[in-house]
């Protein structure tokens, strides 16, 4: 798996992250474009744990909607991960191809389907991504979407893990994580997917919070302020307050006006406040909104009311792989 840096010609810089710089590169032997993720190594501290985690996860995750890790080059002061080259991230794609960053619904449907397939593969392999956002979703010129940057991902084979709650860019962070949950499930990636879904439709982030508390308030303004009746056990969270302003849930049709009722039903299922009420990636892929992709010759189905979630949740309860520990 370990190659030599002389195999690759470094081209322009593509971006800089918390622990790595990414360059466009070319395989000298084949001429194929690659992305070179360079991580500087501190001689005293050695390879960062984030990088080791990313490498071990990426090697295991072989799927059409997950960026392929081709090679790992380890030198004394540098670690280079060689990934398949993708043309742009979703954020850039929306800026270039969107109408004021909002995408055509056919494109949104294709990208959501691919995103959920990538998420389902991760979850089936007991991996949480934990940092899904438009900047971490990569698009190539064939219109394929792939999950990238597993720097914060963590395999969750051991039940009752207490994870650090310093994950996921604020805007895409699930309310249970914001409230201080340290033992969460696949449902945190589902919330992020819902936020990305709405953003692709409107061109604007759904919950652009400035800090943890502000992020919660922005969610409550739209989804309603939760309480023990609507979310049993919420008062046990570390960051819970019993004096939050009371907001009533808003009609999502007003927030995402260009989305049809079936799409709104899916969005509502992804953005359930209680983690155990959120739909799973597998259930989401079977949602009628995707039938033109999954069953192109079938008769269209219609849901009676996109806001009647209770009945749907009783039929398809979210089954977390890790038990929720509060």
Swiss-Prot record:
It comes from the Eukaryota. The active site is at residue 131. Residues 8-290 form the Protein kinase domain. GO terms for cellular component: cellular bud neck; cytoplasm; nucleus; Pho85-Pho80 CDK-cyclin complex. Residues 305-326 have a biased composition (Low complexity). GO terms for molecular function: ATP binding; cyclin-dependent protein serine/threonine kinase activity; protein serine kinase activity. GO terms for biological process: DNA damage response; filamentous growth; G1/S transition of mitotic cell cycle; lipid homeostasis; negative regulation of calcium-mediated signaling; negative regulation of glycogen biosynthetic process; negative regulation of macroautophagy; negative regulation of phosphate metabolic process. It catalyses: L-seryl-[protein] + ATP = O-phospho-L-seryl-[protein] + ADP + H(+); L-threonyl-[protein] + ATP = O-phospho-L-threonyl-[protein] + ADP + H(+). Keywords: ATP-binding, Kinase, Nucleotide-binding, Serine/threonine-protein kinase, Transferase. ATP binds at residues 14-22, 37. InterPro entries: CDK, Kinase-like_dom_sf, Prot_kinase_dom, Protein_kinase_ATP_BS, Ser/Thr_kinase_AS. Pfam families: Pkinase. Residues 300-326 are annotated as: Disordered. Its EC number is 2.7.11.22. The keyword rRNA-binding does not apply. Disulfide bonds: none annotated. Belongs to the protein kinase superfamily. CMGC Ser/Thr protein kinase family. CDC2/CDKX subfamily. When phosphate concentrations are high it phosphorylates the PHO4 transcription factor thus establishing repression. Interacts with a number of cyclins. This is Negative regulator of the PHO system. It comes from Candida albicans (Yeast). The lineage of its organism: Eukaryota, Fungi, Dikarya, Ascomycota, Saccharomycotina.
